[in-house]
Amino acid sequence: MILSGKQIKDSLGKDIVIEPFNEKQINPNSYNLKLHNELLVYDEEVLDMKKPNKTKKLIIPEEGIVLEPRKLYLGRTLEYTETDKYVPMLEGRSSIGRLGVFIHVTAGFGDVGFKGYWTLEIFCVEPIRIYSGVEICQIYYHDVGGDYEKYSSGKYQNNKGIQPSLLYKDFIN
């Protein structure tokens, strides 16, 4: 079952944390999250799964920044979230998608117990000017059936900002 907007609001401070929270961003069954003003781009000709890849930080100015097609931009949500007993899911807003912008390539699924900012895998099909503070995606929550263990020690848990791929850690050992 997906939580309603009212259930999301009622769970704030208990099983769900969204900081900062703005009631205007609540939808019937989700909450809109905003884009932070920082982006990362990979600074390598060829990315390598077995090693950390160099990145370069971009700051989105007030007048926005034009994203190039066929280039991956890593962004993050302005909001910090925590979930105690629900599965958090992230989807792009349809208004953003209708401009040819994808906010996640594959990672729209969170784990029960996730704490941190959501890293966005932003990709566009045409050049587009984007702005920090835009409501770029929405988070929604599923109930979990059965017993579960909370996510507590994963690579991306308790992050403080944009997280480039840490896949290389899976190759250690």
Swiss-Prot record:
InterPro entries: dCTP_deaminase (IPR011962), dUTPase-like_sf (IPR036157), dUTPase_trimeric (IPR033704). Homotrimer. Keywords: Hydrolase, Nucleotide metabolism, Nucleotide-binding. This is dCTP deaminase, dUMP-forming. Its EC number is 3.5.4.30. NCBIfam families: dCTP_deam. GO terms for biological process: dUMP biosynthetic process; dUTP biosynthetic process; nucleobase-containing small molecule interconversion. HAMAP family: dCTP_deaminase. DCTP binds at residues 93-98, 111, 119-121, 138, 151. The active site is at residue 121. Bifunctional enzyme that catalyzes both the deamination of dCTP to dUTP and the hydrolysis of dUTP to dUMP without releasing the toxic dUTP intermediate. It comes from the Bacteria. The record marks 108-109 as: Important for bifunctional activity.
